[in-house]
Amino acid sequence: MQFIQNTILGFFDSSQKSYEIPVYQRAYSWEEANWKTFLDDLLEQINGDNNYFFGNLLLEVIEKNKKYEIIDGQQRITTLSIFFRSLFNTTTKRKTETALEKFSSTDKEIIFLRNGGNIKLRPIQYDRACYDALIIDNDINFETCSPSQDKIKKAKKYFEDALDKLETKIILSILDK
């Protein structure tokens, strides 16, 4: 077993990397208390109150430097990608010149969500259509059909609402972490 310390950007950095959640993993289950802790931890790091530690992830290499299965950490990684979709939506709504100079949603989407046909995170089949519609394609009209899909949709809304309340400079500083 090999341990590698990495940043969030380093985790997603390659246009070829993709992560799949194996069929035996549970569906998305995080709720508001988890989302709040996730966001609070990020904001504390920005304020210098702590060094955000995302935690350990256990990956199985399927194809070296390209394809991995997430054995442990799938709830955190799924939440992170939902958070980034919400972050992209929030910064896109804000028309400040500073935000536009610093943040290109197209560039960040390529890094964190997809590059062409390569989707970075593939949830379990049960949640995949929902995830692709709400997070990858940003379809606001997608109708959920399960508790886990409801949670994906609610997480996206939770983060968008929370980010809407923050100053643009704070939101942009999240991208630097």
Label the model's feature ranges.
Residues 1-177:
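Glycine- and hydrophobic-rich flexible loops that cap the catalytic core of alpha/beta enzyme folds
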